[in-house]
Amino acid sequence: AGASYFSQEGNMGRLDYDRWNFRAGVNANIGKWTKASFQISGDMGEQNNARNGISGGGTDADFNSLMTHLPFVPDYIGGRPVVYTGMQNVSSNLTAVQLYNFRAVQNSPDNTENQTNNMSINGSLEHDFGWFKWTKGLKLKASYSRNIVNGKSNNIGTKINVYRLLNRGGSGGHLYTGDDIDLDESNFGTFTLDNGNLLTRTMNKTDSYQMNLTLSYARQFGLHNVSGLFSIEKAESEYEYVTGNITDPFSFTDGQSNSTATGATQTTTFSRTES
């Protein structure tokens, strides 16, 4: 038997990962002619990271945002997340990538949470009929295995206000830092970064099992070897999932469906398959 724990934090923004693994097993002889075995193993994991709802999302998009961020443009000015609007300080037609502010997203409730929970069970019981002279070489074995996989994903994506500095500093009016920067609210133009504008929750489960009954015979009579095998197997598997999403969450949402604006659109999808 054994168990292990693994934890990791990101060196780039908000990222937490935790995972537990466990395993146990036993093999036993029940008298001279019968033996049994049993094993159980599983894991539980959870990952949380800030949600990047643009350019494909994920940590790769975050890395790209940081690599292409202009070093002379601070993330915040006067407590407001700012974006670079070009040498001409344009006020429209900015793409979502241009509006993306890495720190603003990191400081928002926007989050992706993935949880997994897996378990495997295996057991067998075997009996040797060698205790009776007419059934020597005859063995009967029954085995059972089951696998259960559970997954859950929660996503929070809001709309975040980011800002354009209307009158920049310096003699050329292009600097974002300096003592001459006007920090009054009137010197900031507002843009909206759409980082998904929805809440989603997805849950899925896969449950499968297999049973085998095997009758085998192997015996030598003088110069002759006689053997045979008979087996019966039964297996079933089922999968089901449910997904729900709702639009227009508040900027202070806690990820629940009641923390959204009036008139938000809510949808639910679910399915189940068996084999």
Which stretches of residues belong to each language-model region?
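Acidic, glycine-rich active-site loops and adjacent beta-strand->loop/helix elements
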Residues: S7, S41-G45, R146-I148, I232-E236
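Outer-membrane beta-barrel transmembrane domain signature of Gram-negative proteins
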Residues: T158, V162, N167-S275
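Outer-membrane beta-barrel transmembrane strands
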Residues: G2-F6, L94-I156, G196-S227, Y239-Y241, ...
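Short acidic, gly/pro-rich beta-turn/loop elements at beta-sheet edges
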Residues: N11, K32-T34, N48-A50, K133, ...
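Alpha-helix N-cap/helix-initiation motif
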Residues: N11-R19, R23, N27, T112-N114, ...
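A surface-exposed, glycine/aromatic-enriched loop/edge motif typical of exported proteins
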Residues: D43-N93, N150-D182, T243
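"Short basic amphipathic alpha-helical interaction patches in structured regions
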Residues: R14-R19, A104-Q106, I156-K159, N245-I246
